[in-house]
A protein has these predicted regions:
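Short intrinsically disordered terminal tails
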Residues: 1-2, 69-71
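Anionic N-terminal interaction surfaces
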Residues: 1-11, 18-19, 24
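Acidic, low-complexity, intrinsically disordered interaction modules
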Residues: 16-65
Length: 71
């Protein structure tokens, strides 16, 4: 099971292959204001572009993803 870690202080999101901070990072994003929980069963990572507009950059299924929010 993969793990998504969203840090609200540093505004980062990291997706780990397995256990957070003990396994390989699959992908990491900066300038992440929020991670949305979508009605269709996905976590959606939103990132700010140069115009400060939020764009979806990653969708992962809730069914096989643990998510942790750090501050």
């Amino acid at each position: 099971m993969q793990t998504l870690v969203f840090n609200t202080t540093t505004r980062t999101a990291k997706l780990y292959e397995g256990v957070a901070e003990k396994s390989e990072i699959i992908v990491a994003y900066t300038e992440v204001p929020t991670v949305k929980v979508m009605d269709d069963g996905f976590y959606q990572v939103m990132q700010l572009d140069a115009m400060e507009k939020q764009l979806p950059v990653l969708r992962v299924p809730i069914a096989n993803t643990n998510m942790f929010v750090k501050s």
